[in-house]
Amino acid sequence: MADQLTEEQIAEFKEAFSLFDKDGDGTITTKELGTVMRSLGQNPTEAELQDMINEVDADGNGTIDFPEFLSLMARKMKDTDTEEELIEAFKVFDRDGNGLISAAELRHVMTNLGEKLTDEEVDEMIREADIDGDGHINYEEFVRMMMAK
């Protein structure tokens, strides 16, 4: 999987890896993994980090070497918001299936997620994502918003 990375990506990952390999022994500790990945623009949850560490740290010694790290990053990058996932997420918000997310639809989904938002907050979210200014979020605007996170 790491063979799908460009030389530039590998060099970038090596540089980040080296920053956290304090003693230069070619390994980083598992608790440093989250810091390394965040420095590369990934945003794993604690649960995801634990899963990744469990997958990579086969001997359970608490350290990860560079080849393991490369494999991990390649896998993580491949998993980053595929088009199918974005389409599915858009459909969750676009409750009436008209290809647009309205303020009411956004409020409904956010409320179901436990986010109690004021009308002003919902309107602000729409405004931030609404590139063409029609008061709704279309699929293209949704993708841009999701990729900007």
From Swiss-Prot:
InterPro entries: CALM/Myosin/TropC-like, EF-hand-dom_pair, EF_Hand_1_Ca_BS, EF_hand_dom. The keyword Acetylation applies. Ca(2+) 2 binds at D57, D59, N61, T63, E68. SMART domains: EFh (SM00054). Belongs to the calmodulin family. This protein has four functional calcium-binding sites. The modification N-acetylalanine is found at A2. Ca(2+) 4 binds at D130, D132, D134, H136, E141. This is Calmodulin. GO terms for molecular function: calcium ion binding. Ca(2+) 3 binds at D94, D96, N98, E105.
